[in-house]
Amino acid sequence: MQKDLRIVIIGAGMAGILAAIKLLENNYKNFTLYEKADQVGGTWRDNSYPGLTCDVPSHHYTYSFERNPAWSRYYSPGPEIKEYFQNVFKKYSLQEYTQFGAEVKSMDFISNQWHIGFADGFNEIADVVIGATGVLHHPKMPDIAGIDSFQGHIFHSSKWQHELELGNLNVGVIGNGSSGVQIVGALGGECKSLFHFQRTAQWMMPLDNGIFSSEEQVAFQDPKIMNEAMQFDEYFDAVNRYSQALLDMESDGAKEMANICKDNLIENVKDVELRKKLTPNHRPLCKRLVWSSDYYPCLLYTSPSPRDS
């Protein structure tokens, strides 16, 4: 690598942090990591809604060189993931190369260099720009007639208002992708009434999210035991089967996953009318699957009302 190249990294989420670490590993220090927020973490910083959980196994949602034996569950809750990336950031002293509150507003490629403009008027020139901005950091509010005149509280899931007490409020959740389903599963029984508005029903894959005991967490500090726990062959086989199922709806994997989704709905939702509302009009895997073992029980035991919208 030419040592005189000026490098800029935009975004201090998991990709930006990794890029900075790898530059330092190669003894390259002529770079700056720019982050528009006041702390690192990317999507795990921006999202903090109730029930936030990763649908990738905890031990696989880490850098290969920074294993974390302290995960509390097989699928980690959002706050733990945020803490993990913040700890890695500190361990590698990346704060020395980072500027917070620096939002990029423009980039122009002039004479083989990037001319970068920031929201505060600052300008930077770089030979190389590594874009690590992600795609989910600009909340999209639905365009609903009358939304501007709504007199109650309204906010996007990525801007959760934790100071708001929901116990005596009627709450409506719009959307039934992963975020909406996780929120409803977490809010069941926590508010006066709960309504879930869905445009189309979703197929649900059960998510067995076991808790790691303190003994297991201690054992995971042994690299050999950690490698055994990660079950690389089984995990990547499952990933490959899922990918193949998406490409071939007639494959054995696709049929198996479809049957799991259908059985999950039948076994957990006995009410015929409610089951009709929750049955999609498309085959499983036509859309990205939602993974949850909390949603159906929440509907049954806390009586949130799914509404088509």
Predicted regions and their residues:
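Rossmann-like dinucleotide-binding core of oxidoreductases
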Residues: A19, E25, N30, L136-I260
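Conserved N-terminal glycine-rich FAD pyrophosphate-binding loop of Rossmann-like flavoproteins
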Residues: Q39-T62, P206-E216
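Single conserved hydrophobic/aromatic residue that forms the stacking wall/gate
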Residues: Y301-S309
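Feature captures the FAD/FMN-dependent oxidoreductase FAD-binding
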Residues: Y74-T133
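Rossmann-like flavin
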Residues: Q39, K91-Q95, E103-K105, W203-M205, ...
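Short beta-strand to alpha-helix junction loop
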Residues: P69-N87, S251-A254, P284-D294
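Beta1/beta-strand and adjacent pyrophosphate-binding region of the FAD-binding site
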Residues: K3-A15, N170-I174
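Catalytic cores of eukaryotic secretory-pathway lumenal/extracellular enzymes that build
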Residues: T62-N68
